Amino acid sequence: DGRTPALRLRF
């Protein structure tokens, strides 16, 4: 995913 490190845990 190309999202933030924190949100990567969920998304």
From Swiss-Prot:
Residues with PTM Phenylalanine amide? F11
Q: Name one GO cellular component term.
A: extracellular region
Task: Decide whether keyword Secreted is in the record.
Answer: yes
The compartments listed are: Secreted
Q: Enumerate the Gene Ontology biological process terms.
A: neuropeptide signaling pathway
Question: Keyword Secreted on this protein?
Answer: yes
Tell me the keywords, alphabetical order: Amidation, Neuropeptide, Secreted
Q: Which family does it belong to?
A: Belongs to the FARP (FMRFamide related peptide) family.
Any idea what this protein is called? FMRFamide-like neuropeptide FLP6
Q: Per the UniProt entry, what species is this protein from, by scientific name?
A: Penaeus monodon (Giant tiger prawn)
